[in-house]
A protein has these predicted regions:
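Terminal, low-structured helical/coil segments at or just beyond the last alpha-helical repeat
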Residues: 99-139
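"A position-specific structural signal for the A-helix of alpha-solenoid helical repeats
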Residues: 12, 50, 84, 130-133, ...
Length: 139
């Protein structure tokens, strides 16, 4: 198994635990996921998103923010980067900054989806939820 495959499998496991409310399992496995992602030599945008999402689940906004910043530095309109950036700001109770990222998400949505980026297909539910939430906030 490659380091990337290992990191991805651990990510899937921890996110399943988080969605099932198994906090003890999240606490047990999250450090392994974070370590596996730190060992990736050239992480993809998708892998950076995974790293940020697990950091979000364990309440590490500085990691979430760093991954979002890196993703957006690589691709300014990245839906994954914008979703992650808004979540990072909300973790830090900075709703006004989160709304800025929500607005950018809505502005970038159609253009980015038109690229048919496979990462967007893999995380479509999360993107759709972030878009729905942003629209409810009446950005």
């Amino acid at each position: 198994m490659t380091p990337s495959e290992r990191a991805n499998r651990l990510y899937v496991r921890v996110m399943q635990y988080a969605e099932s409310g198994k906090a003890d399992s999240v606490t047990r496995f999250a450090p392994m996921v974070l370590a596996a992602h730190q060992m990736l030599q050239t992480p993809s945008i998708d892998e950076r998103y995974h790293y940020g999402r697990v950091a979000e689940v364990v309440g590490a906004p500085e990691i979430v923010k760093a991954q979002a910043d890196t993703i957006l530095g690589l691709r300014a309109g990245s839906l994954l980067g914008l979703v992650l950036a808004a979540r990072a700001e909300r973790l830090e109770k900075n709703d006004s900054a989160a709304r800025v990222f929500d607005k950018r998400l809505l502005q970038s949505l159609e253009r980015e989806l038109a690229t048919q980026n496979p990462d967007y297909a893999n995380h479509r539910e999360e993107i759709d939820q972030a878009v729905a939430d942003a629209r409810l906030r009446k950005i």
